[in-house]
Curated annotation (Swiss-Prot):
Stretches that traverse the bilayer: none
Keywords carried by this UniProt record: Ribonucleoprotein, Ribosomal protein
InterPro entries per record: Ribosomal_bL27
Alphabetized SUPFAM superfamilies for the sequence: Ribosomal L27 protein-like
GO terms, molecular function: structural constituent of ribosome
Record carries keyword Ribosomal protein: yes
Residue segments, region Disordered: 1-21
Name of the molecule in the record: Large ribosomal subunit protein bL27
Ribosomal protein as UniProt keyword: yes
Any Gene Ontology CC annotation: cytosolic large ribosomal subunit
Family matches, as PANTHER family: LARGE RIBOSOMAL SUBUNIT PROTEIN BL27M, RIBOSOMAL PROTEIN L27
GO BP: translation
Protein family per UniProt: Belongs to the bacterial ribosomal protein bL27 family.
């Protein structure tokens, strides 16, 4: 009887967990300072008024307001936060 013994170990069979990237707050949504708007690798989106960019390219709000996405130079997509007018006064 032919038997196969002591086969080599496989080098496959592992995977890394997803990094949970993407847009977290969409156009028109209200944000407060510190809210993460986009998690990304590289600069798929660029910061404009009312937002900042972290060292891992995360775009976050720096002011209260509503998120807007718009195209700019070199066909880049910019994200800004436009302050909402205080209607309470």
């Amino acid at each position: 009887m032919a038997h196969k013994k002591a086969g080599g170990s496989s080098r496959n069979g592992r995977d890394s967990a997803g990094r949970r990237l993407g847009v977290k707050k969409y156009g028109g949504e209200a944000v407060i300072p510190g809210n993460i708007i986009v998690r990304q690798r590289g600069t798929k989106f660029w910061p404009a008024a009312g937002v900042g960019m972290g060292k891992d390219h995360t775009i976050f709000a720096t002011v209260d307001g509503a998120v807007t996405f718009h195209k700019g130079l070199k066909n880049r997509t910019f994200i800004s936060v436009l302050p909402v007018a205080e209607a309470a006064e």
